């Protein structure tokens, strides 16, 4: 393979990916396109559909080399629906001025293109000293049941886990180089259904008001300060998101009440411990209550070490900024990867992600490519 065949231009690849209408759960040809590019660079590729046989979730894993250090780039090709009112066709990959427009350019087809271009530039210098892989899912913007989680489990079963993973989420709020994510809070939702006895409001002694029991339980839950934060995390937060009784009458005590809450928790807690606490409080106020808990991810932290330092130095060398190490924001697929290897997140500027006219500056695509290349070189590849 000659150097001229390597896809070193991130803009060209990003535009090709943007033209694939991969609104989750559809793929739109994005992963086949990417697989073809990677195979042309010498990667071994695996198409890994998971989920229902009639509508499987597309996933792509590609690896070049077998040695160590073993670096993985994780990302996704699915995008959220574009909505209405765009100035340009959201799948036309229009360049206007110094910006590239398209659904998913920031989150995160642009990041995928930059990493591929960085690997291409590294290969122009000679063979890798270790191995590089890509884990690309089509189920990040959806339920995330059949994407990164089963793929990383598949890698573990094969004994093919990386030493370190970079997730290319758009971590930067305003400018490239703002933030590297080294952890994320855990997230859990609880649905509490309290059953009472329906009755007339004039005869409360003949009824059992479930709303009062639910409010008492939620008052105790919200009164507790979960923690004051930890070294890398802000304080955990419990928020009541709804209380529903379905009662349109003014003179009826309802027979049941349903409350919902969410907890974003730091590394001082586990989902299991918080679940036990919620159940204990609720059942003291409403012994017959039904509590259903869904934990979408545990809190995790990658302690700053050699790899994170190397990534930070790569960012600084290209942008002149020293990125802030951060754990804020919502959940990401890093919650699945962190159970198997160290992971940090760094990608493009996310100011327009999920918005109408999503776009990035063309220069940031080149700069992110240079950052990924500098990181690979510093990491020993």
From Swiss-Prot:
Swiss-Prot/TrEMBL keywords: Amino-acid biosynthesis, Cobalt, Diaminopimelate biosynthesis, Hydrolase, Lysine biosynthesis, Metal-binding, Zinc
Keyword Hydrolase: yes
Name of the protein: Succinyl-diaminopimelate desuccinylase
UniProt EC number: 3.5.1.18
Active site: 78, 140 (proton acceptor)
Reaction(s) catalysed by this chain's protein: N-succinyl-(2S,6S)-2,6-diaminopimelate + H2O = (2S,6S)-2,6-diaminopimelate + succinate
Note describing how the cofactor binds: Binds 2 Zn(2+) or Co(2+) ions per subunit.
Gene responsible for this protein: dapE
UniProt subunit comment: Homodimer.
Pathway annotation: Amino-acid biosynthesis; L-lysine biosynthesis via DAP pathway; LL-2,6-diaminopimelate from (S)-tetrahydrodipicolinate (succinylase route): step 3/3
GO biological process: diaminopimelate biosynthetic process; L-arginine biosynthetic process; lysine biosynthetic process via diaminopimelate
């Amino acid at each position: 393979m000659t150097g001229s065949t390597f896809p070193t231009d991130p803009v060209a690849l990003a535009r090709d990916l943007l033209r694939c209408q991969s609104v989750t759960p559809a793929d739109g040809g994005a992963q086949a396109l990417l697989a073809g590019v990677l195979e042309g660079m010498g990667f071994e590729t695996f198409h890994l559909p998971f989920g229902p046989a009639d509508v499987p979730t597309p996933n792509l894993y590609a690896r070049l080399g077998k040695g160590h250090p073993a670096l993985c780039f994780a990302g996704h090709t699915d995008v959220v629906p574009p909505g209405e009112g765009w100035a340009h066709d959201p799948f036309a990959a229009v360049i206007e001025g110094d910006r590239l427009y398209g659904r998913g350019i920031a989150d995160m087809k642009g990041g995928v293109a930059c990493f591929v271009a960085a690997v291409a530039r590294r290969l122009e210098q000679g063979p890798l000293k270790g191995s590089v892989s890509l884990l690309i899912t089509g189920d990040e913007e959806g339920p995330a049941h059949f994407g990164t989680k089963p793929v990383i489990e598949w890698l573990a079963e094969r004994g093919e886990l990386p030493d370190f993973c970079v997730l290319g989420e758009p971590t930067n709020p305003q400018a490239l180089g703002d933030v590297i994510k080294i952890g994320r809070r855990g997230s859990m939702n609880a649905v509490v259904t309290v059953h009472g006895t329906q009755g007339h409001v004039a005869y409360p002694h003949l009824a059992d008001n479930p709303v009062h029991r639910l409010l008492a339980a939620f008052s105790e839950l919200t009164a507790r300060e979960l923690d004051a934060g930890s070294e890398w995390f802000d304080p955990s937060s419990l928020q009541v998101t709804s209380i529903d009784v379905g009662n349109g009458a003014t003179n009826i005590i309802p027979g049941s009440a349903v409350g919902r809450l969410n907890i974003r928790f730091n590394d001082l807690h586990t989902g299991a411990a918080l679940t036990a606490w919620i159940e204990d409080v609720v059942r003291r106020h409403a012994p017959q209550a039904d509590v259903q808990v869904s934990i979408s991810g545990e809190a995790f932290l990658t302690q700053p070490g050699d790899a994170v330092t190397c990534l930070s130095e790569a960012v600084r060398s290209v942008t002149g900024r020293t990125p802030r190490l951060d754990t804020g924001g919502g959940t990401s697929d890093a919650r699945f990867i962190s159970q198997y290897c160290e992971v940090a997140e760094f990608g493009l500027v996310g100011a327009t992600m999920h918005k109408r006219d999503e776009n990035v500056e063309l220069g940031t695509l080149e700069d992110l490519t240079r950052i990924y290349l500098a990181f690979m070189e510093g990491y020993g590849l």
